[in-house]
Amino acid sequence: MSHFSVLVIGENVEQQLAPYHEFECTGTDDQFVQDVDLTVEAKARFDNETETCLKAPDGTLHEFFDEHGNWRPEFSQPDPKAPVHDSGRRTHFIPPGYEKIDVPAAMVTTFAEWTQGWYGMKAVPFGAEPDKAGEHKYGFILLNEAGNVLKAIKRTNPNKKWDWWEFGGRWSGFLKLKPGASGELGRRGLMGSCADDSPGRADIARKGDIDFEGMRNKAGVQAAERWDKVEQATGGLLWTNWESVREAHKGDIDTARNVYHAQSAKVAACKALGDPWGGVDEYLTPRDQYIQQARDSSTVTYALVKDSQWAARGEMGWFGVSRDEVATDDWNRKFNELIDSLPDDTLITVIDCHI
């Protein structure tokens, strides 16, 4: 479960985000929900599944649980390790002469029964229609006249990206307004968390009212100050980055850590930044490049939605960049180019998404 920021370009924010809702959480049964056939997947899983059961002295097989998922009293007992708050918990009991074994699932249950239990979907009797507004809302199993599985259907949105969202949230105040310009603030995140609570910030504003260049300039100045502080502390000496040290000591992570953290220049850099165990390898980047990276990233969110099309780093098809070739710098550069090309009356909205 995580939060991430999304920049929505244009009007009708709710409609633009709608194609990406997680049906299992929103419960919104709309045109974006699809019936996904899981039959082949389910059968392959069932064929390889095993069940733990008891083999009686006469060779018959017995399950620990009944058809409702409850312990069978003859094959269970109070759990002596159960905590006080769960004193009713039970555990396996193996009667004398019985043997606990793993057997193919097909030996103790039918494919229809197993599929209902595994996927949590109820069966639709032969000749009946699924109740998509009720018990079959999130999926169902179609049975033939003999009670065997015809299809196992999961109802979901394959394009799901979020289960809930809000304006601003943890990124409230992300946008810097130009002097005299107006915008709107959404709600802050948990415990009042936000991107920037200083005056002149917004979560919703027109592109022409947003001081994107000011955001970049501030980030660039701060990056230069940090880089110069590290440069002064190390006297211009470099250290070997973590990836290289780890590769040099492959298979011995403790030695790699010790060697990496013992480098005098690395120690000086961490001390200068007031974070003895922090990551400082980014300061091995040349100064001008480091500053440019900071400028570019200052206006960038995790994902972007325009004309109801979702894009994120690694999913940049409509940016004209191969998914396999996308790097952070490429994403940030294309993101900024798009923002700068927008008409000044374009609505810009920052969203806090959760998944």
Predicted regions: what they are:
Residues 2-3, 353-355:
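Histidine-centered active-site/metal-ligand motif
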Residues 1-337, 341:
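Acidic (Asp/Glu-rich) sequence patches and key acidic residues
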Residues 347-350:
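A cross-kingdom marker for long, charged
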